[in-house]
Regions:
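Fungal secretory targeting signals
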Residues: 1-18
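Exposed boundary/loop context
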Residues: 2, 9, 56, 222-224
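Intrinsic-disorder/low-complexity peptide segments enriched for small residues
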Residues: 3-8, 40-45, 189, 208
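A generic structural signal for short, solvent-exposed coil/turn residues
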Residues: 5-8, 37, 114, 202
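Disulfide-stabilized extracellular ectodomain repeats and their linkers
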Residues: 16, 23, 32-33, 119, ...
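Betabetaalpha-Me/HNH-type nuclease active-site subdomain
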Residues: 19-105
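C-terminal, well-folded lobe of enzymatic/effector domains
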Residues: 104-240
């Protein structure tokens, strides 16, 4: 058994060293190791606009969700029950205090418990990022490294793709109502891809979803959404 574990570690190390950084998820033919390119290769960054939560001039995070290349969901109960945990908050606080603080600011639960929210997102979605399986790290793996890497990537993507900045630079400001195409065009002109918008039944903006393919293991490349979402006509952008 010890020999087998050592062999598996060596294989994982070789994979980590030989992955091509040019492979784009959902765009390759043949076989590519799922440590090198995500099995669920169309990834959705869902951002929330929830009055009372997060900074008044920032969208906050709902989650980063791996989907199939056709846009279907990954398994609803996650992809690896052995890595399910209800302690994401304590893990982050003890492992990376800076990340923990960023998440409290930009990834708050609108139901009151950040740890439960983050743990749900990890268990359902984070465990489905195949390139973050512990075996993909080889001998360099440190316990919880994949959790830190997942949440770091999500927060970094939120910072990099500044939806509020895209809207404000195009004159789309909270407290006003605009046509849905005004939102779509403003975000596309700034970020380079068409987003998906979600509204509640009253026509109030609640979420903006950005779609990505992944180049190599973790280089996210924005792409157009598969559909425009649930917003129609006049959309109200509430103040926080």
């Amino acid at each position: 058994m010890k020999y087998i574990l050592v062999l598996l570690g060596l294989v994982a190390s070789v994979i980590a060293q030989t992955c091509s950084s040019n492979v784009l998820s959902c765009h390759w033919s043949g076989k590519v190791d799922s440590c090198c390119s995500p099995k669920y290769g169309l990834v959705v960054l869902n951002l929330q606009w929830s009055p009372g939560y997060g900074p008044s001039d920032e969208f906050t995070i709902h989650g980063l969700w791996p989907d199939t290349c056709e846009g279907r969901y990954a398994p609803r109960n996650g992809c690896d029950r052995s890595r399910i945990t209800n302690s994401i908050g304590p893990i982050l606080r003890s492992s990376n205090g800076t990340l923990y603080n960023r998440m409290n600011t930009f990834w708050p639960s609108n139901k009151g418990n950040n740890n439960i929210f983050w743990s749900h997102e990890w268990n359902k979605h984070g465990t489905c990022v195949s390139t973050l399986r512990p075996s993909c790290y080889g001998s360099s793996y440190v316990k919880y490294q994949e959790i830190i890497d997942y949440f770091n990537k999500v927060v970094d993507l939120r910072d990099q793709y500044d939806v509020y900045g895209a809207l404000s630079l195009n004159g789309v400001l909270p407290g006003n109502t605009y046509n849905v195409n005004t939102f779509l065009d403003a975000i596309q002109s700034y970020l380079g891809a068409r987003p998906m918008l979600h509204c509640d039944r009253s026509g109030t903006l609640t979420d903006v979803a950005l779609y990505f393919y992944v180049k190599g293991r973790d280089n996210y490349v924005i792409t157009n959404s598969l559909n425009s979402g649930s917003c129609r006509g006049a959309v109200y952008f509430p103040e926080k």
